[in-house]
């Protein structure tokens, strides 16, 4: 499938996301698997110097950016950082001017803000999946994230 854009009727999209990093910090990658009906799209990318948490966030941001119209999206992630950030911490960070409960600046704030903006375009449900536990979508996203690491390493 060339483009998984979503239709104007709020198409249902299932999305699996993952991030990987060798060194943490070090070369990292992100991967996304999206399915809508019979259509499927995969994406990956990477950075030469990054962290695992940044790559986890980038996977979701890039997956949502690829949807050109508002959709109903179920995001499957093995990242507690992303899951808790979006379902527990985000509202308080925003209320405190992007500060934690300890009054420290939120780490990766520009990525959290970008993710918040993308989530606002869609109806999003969050699902946590255990990593490396046989979930086929998560395993594919993990493989894509590792492709992103290799691309960042220049291989």
Swiss-Prot record:
Pfam families: RNase_H. It is found in: Cytoplasm. GO terms for cellular component: cytoplasm. InterPro entries: RNase_H, RNaseH-like_sf, RNaseH_domain, RNaseH_sf, RNaseHI. It catalyses: Endonucleolytic cleavage to 5'-phosphomonoester. Residues 9-150 form the RNase H type-1 domain. Signal peptide: none annotated. Binds 1 Mg(2+) ion per subunit. May bind a second metal ion at a regulatory site, or after substrate binding. NCBIfam families: PRK00203.1. This is Ribonuclease H. The gene is rnhA.
